[in-house]
């Protein structure tokens, strides 16, 4: 294990950015999101949760797929180049890292998404443990330990020092690249770190949503959950704004669109939301026609369909962003609690 003083982190960021792109939490206009590092960036590692998840690094909100060029009567198709430059995402929390694993199951399964696969190949994740989990957090419900994030490099901020462990080959390579800025940790440091982990877990145990029950949400009771009358009242406050889907670290739905460049056409994909009335709109009109159906689909996918098809892995990581951002205060916690209270299938 290594360590580096907090006041030396700027030098660490500079060293990393000399050879590859570096993305980390940066405050802009009062909001913190993952941005490319620059020497004058207002880095905010102490922020527990960015407004949006850092999934943009691997699954951008918008990306070009290919261009069709027109030259008289001739057309040529030019595929967009795949990601080739290495990059580091620094400061990811355990919940967001689990979110990437959910995306992996989708985009790295056959047929493999080459754009996503290239970014995963060239990306290195540096995790940071959650020093003070917030009341909206419920990652523990999904078996996530925010005190022990699993990534290429795991870090903890303790008493003004960043502790650094690198369990993967990518992590080892990054460690060697910045080794001159790191110092070896000793036994006292190891004790401090274990004390920090214990303190973090103690906070998690006291969070208001830490005891949510997922009983019956693993796909075994699909029909009962789907047909439950609970949905008929639960969905009504939903505004169909899609905020929950855009801040969520596991949502992977996208649309594909074309736009005229004046010299041809660019085809690109962009995030979409299952909460929108035109989501999956097709000529034969089989998209879900009511807000109730769309609302039910979102949470059935998170809690039933996805785990049923992915060895019990849920498509929610308990980050709490939907809890904080929904303007109608309607979120996955309320859904789970509603079924706990009313039995769901009664």
Regions found by a protein language model. Give the residues of each.
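Iron-sulfur-associated redox domains of electron-transfer enzymes in respiratory
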Residues: 1-221
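Ferredoxin-type iron-sulfur electron-transfer modules in oxidoreductases and energy-metabolism complexes
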Residues: 213-236, 254-346
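A donor-sugar binding/catalytic signature common to diverse glycosyltransferases
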Residues: 243-259
């Amino acid at each position: 294990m290594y360590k580096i003083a907090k006041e030396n982190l700027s030098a660490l960021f500079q060293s990393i950015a000399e050879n590859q792109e570096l993305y980390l939490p940066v405050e802009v206009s009062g909001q913190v999101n993952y941005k490319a590092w620059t020497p004058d960036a207002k880095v905010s590692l102490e922020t527990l949760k960015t407004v949006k998840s850092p999934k943009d690094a691997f699954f951008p909100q918008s990306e070009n797929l290919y261009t069709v060029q027109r030259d008289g009567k001739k057309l040529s198709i030019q595929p967009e180049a795949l990601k080739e430059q290495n990059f580091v995402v620094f400061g990811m929390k355990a919940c967001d890292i689990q979110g990437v694993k959910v995306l992996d199951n989708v985009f790295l399964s056959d047929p493999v998404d080459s754009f996503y696969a290239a970014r995963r190949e060239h990306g290195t994740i540096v995790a940071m443990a959650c020093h003070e989990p917030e009341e909206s957090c419920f990652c523990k419900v999904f078996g996530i330990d925010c005190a022990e994030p699993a990534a290429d490099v795991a870090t903890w901020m303790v008493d003004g020092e960043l502790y650094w462990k690198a369990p993967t080959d990518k992590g080892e390579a990054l460690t060697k690249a910045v080794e001159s800025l790191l110092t070896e940790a000793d036994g006292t440091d190891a004790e401090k770190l274990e004390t920090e982990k214990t303190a973090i877990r103690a906070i998690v145990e006291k969070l208001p949503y830490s005891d949510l029950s997922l009983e019956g949400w693993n796909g075994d009771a699909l029909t009962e959950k789907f047909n439950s009358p609970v949905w008929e009242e639960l969905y009504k406050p939903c505004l169909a704004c899609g905020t929950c889907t855009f801040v969520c670290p596991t949502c992977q739905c996208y649309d594909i669109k074309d736009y005229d460049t004046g010299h041809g056409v660019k085809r690109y994909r962009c995030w979409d939301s299952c909460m929108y009335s035109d989501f999956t709109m097709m000529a034969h009109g089989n998209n879900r026609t009511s807000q109730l159906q769309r609302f039910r689909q979102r949470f059935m996918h998170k809690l039933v369909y996805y785990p049923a098809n992915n060895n019990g892995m849920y498509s929610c990581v308990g980050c709490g962003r939907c809890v904080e951002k929904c303007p109608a205060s309607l979120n996955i916690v309320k859904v789970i609690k509603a079924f706990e209270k009313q039995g769901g299938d009664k």
